[in-house]
Regions:
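A well-structured
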Residues: 1-310
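Post-HEXXH active-site segment of zinc metalloproteases
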Residues: 385-386, 397-420
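Short pre-active-site segment immediately N-terminal to the catalytic Zn-binding motif
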Residues: 312-317, 368-388
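Long, amphipathic alpha-helical stalk/connector segments used for oligomerization, subunit docking
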Residues: 428-445
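Long, K/E/R/D-enriched contiguous segments that form extended
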Residues: 289, 293-330, 336, 373, ...
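Active-site recognition of the HExxH zinc-binding catalytic motif
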Residues: 250, 378-397, 419
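Catalytic zinc-binding patch centered on the HExxH motif and its immediate surroundings
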Residues: 313-315, 348-370
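An active-site-proximal "capping" alpha-helix that borders the catalytic cofactor pocket
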Residues: 391, 414-427
């Protein structure tokens, strides 16, 4: 599991479509252009919505310019965030993250009047504007935005919160990523002392050797415990930051901002949670079944991801690519073709290396740019599913290019449907190709 050939060696993304590197002069040029454009936009449109000086076509034109400006203003910070995810210990990248974040905040504060006016305008004043054909594609955005009206502050207060985030939430999130990316885990694997990344250690929890799994988990916890003071401070401050902002915005419940962003009613989430709780016995029966298949009386937490098939071989990254494209192709040739672009055009960073942030994600800037996927591929079946999952997001973004920028990002409950669907396609393909009941059992358990 720790041989280089399994770990997508050399599979890194190409970000040159955005910028050539952290020193690219186009970054500063775009930051300056965004600032200049935002000032001009504010001069042109401040007070126009509140004052009723825009008709439907005029508002659509303003929204279109706002989208174009947002694309330019977000590009430097988006690029910096991708660089940082791949190289959390690179000081030049860290500096770029801070520089672009500060510039993005300045630009956002110049533009915040626009969304505030869209939120504040009375329904009877807005309704006639929405009848213009040019406004049809912006109605969903406006409906979603205006749901936040009871929790929106004054322009000055919103600007202060944005500035506070530079040394508050955003700063603590970056500190966590830098600290996590710096951690190394020393343990013995197959008689050999190794220094592993967090992704490599977590991959060991899917090894058939129970002792190795327990050892890996112990080292993982102990290494983090060595930094418990900093980690505890980070988590507590993030919780307090969220609590304070919810109080300022007069939310009755700290989860309500998430529900609004996800465009889902709290009652729906509560109903789902209750349904899950009612079916706890089903999950418990699964765990009892897995314990029997593994030959244990009871499962430990380190057994949850243990493979049923102890002889299962690691999966090289090229084989994972073939499995994913084939499984997607059984559903749709277009699905498979889009996925192929991620592999062949270097839209994926899958290599395991020190300093890379943990976990996996798919990120997209705008309909004008293709998405990017990051993961750390260790050759497990779960890693194959993770790549498929993130490609589900990527394909969803790709197919959403016809949308306006303001409608481009899907709420979480919709976005995860696309990614889990991609995992289902992979699983169904593997089950269909399974040569024995034992293989099918290992896929299901």
């Amino acid at each position: 599991m720790t041989t280089a050939g399994l770990k997508a060696e050399g599979v890194s993304w190409d970000l040159s479509e955005l910028y050539s590197g952290p020193d690219d002069p186009h970054i500063e040029a775009d930051l300056a252009e965004a600032q200049r454009w935002a000032e001009a936009f504010a001069q042109a449109y401040r007070g126009k919505i509140a004052g009723g000086q825009l008709d439907g076509p005029g508002l659509a034109k303003a929204l279109a310019e706002y989208e174009a400006l947002s694309d330019v203003s977000h590009r430097p910070s988006f690029y910096a965030s991708l660089l940082f995810a791949a190289e959390t210990q690179n000081t030049k990248v860290q500096q770029l993250v801070q520089r672009t974040r500060e510039a993005a905040t300045e630009t956002a504060n110049l533009l915040i009047f626009f969304s505030l006016e869209l939120i504040a305008v009375e329904e009877q004043q807005l309704a006639p504007l929405l009848t213009a054909p040019e406004m049809a594609e912006y109605q969903h955005y406006l409906e979603t935005l205006r749901r936040f009206k009871p929790h929106t502050l004054s322009e000055k207060e919103e600007q202060l919160l944005n500035q506070r985030n530079l040394t508050g939430r955003s700063a603590f999130e970056q500190l966590y990523e830098e600290l996590s990316g710096s951690l190394r885990f020393r343990l013995t694997v197959n008689g050999e002392e190794q220094e592993l990344t967090d992704g490599e250690v977590m991959a060991l929890l899917r090894q058939p050797d129970r002792t190795l799994r327990e050892h890996a988990f112990t080292v993982f916890l102990e290494t983090h415990a060595g930094h418990s003071l900093v980690l505890t401070s980070i988590f507590n401050n993030l919780l307090l930051d969220h609590k304070v902002e919810c109080a300022l915005r007069q939310y009755d419940d700290v989860v309500l901002p998430t529900h609004l962003a996800n465009e889902i009613a709290p009652q729906t989430v509560e109903a789902m949670m209750q349904a899950v709780e009612r079916h706890y016995p089903l999950a418990q029966e699964y765990f009892r079944l897995k314990a029997r298949l593994l030959g244990f009386d009871r499962l430990k937490n380190t057994d949850l991801y243990a493979p049923i098939d102890a002889q299962a071989e690691a999966i090289p990254f090229p084989q994972a690519q073939t499995l994913i494209q084939t499984s997607f192709g059984r559903f749709s040739e277009q699905f498979a073709a889009i996925a192929a672009d991620f592999f062949t055009r270097r839209w994926i960073d899958a290599e395991v290396r020190g300093g890379k942030r943990g976990g996996a994600f798919c990120a997209a800037l705008s309909p004008r740019h293709h998405p990017y996927v990051l993961c750390s591929y260790n050759g497990t079946g779960r890693d194959v599913a993770t790549v498929a999952h993130e490609l589900g997001h990527g394909i969803h973004y790709w197919l959403s290019r016809r949308q306006k920028l303001l409608n481009y990002d899907a709420p979480l409950v919709l976005a995860e449907t696309a990614s889990v669907f991609a995992e289902i396609l992979l699983t169904r393909h593997l089950l269909a190709e399974a040569q024995s009941p034992a293989v099918r059992r290992s896929l299901l358990c």
